[in-house]
UniProtKB/Swiss-Prot annotation:
Record keywords: Amidation, Neuropeptide, Secreted
Protein name from the UniProt record: Extended FMRFamide-8
GO biological process, one term: neuropeptide signaling pathway
Function summary: FMRFamides and FMRFamide-like peptides are neuropeptides.
Modified residues (Leucine amide): L9
Family per similarity comment: Belongs to the FARP (FMRF amide related peptide) family.
Source organism per UniProt: Namaquaphasma ookiepense
Compartmental location: Secreted
Any one Gene Ontology cellular component term annotated for this protein: extracellular region
Lineage of the organism: Eukaryota, Metazoa, Ecdysozoa, Arthropoda, Hexapoda
Length: 9
């Protein structure tokens, strides 16, 4: 998901 990419940071 898009949020997943951000949370990975």
């Amino acid at each position: 998901a898009r949020t997943d990419n951000f949370v990975r940071l």
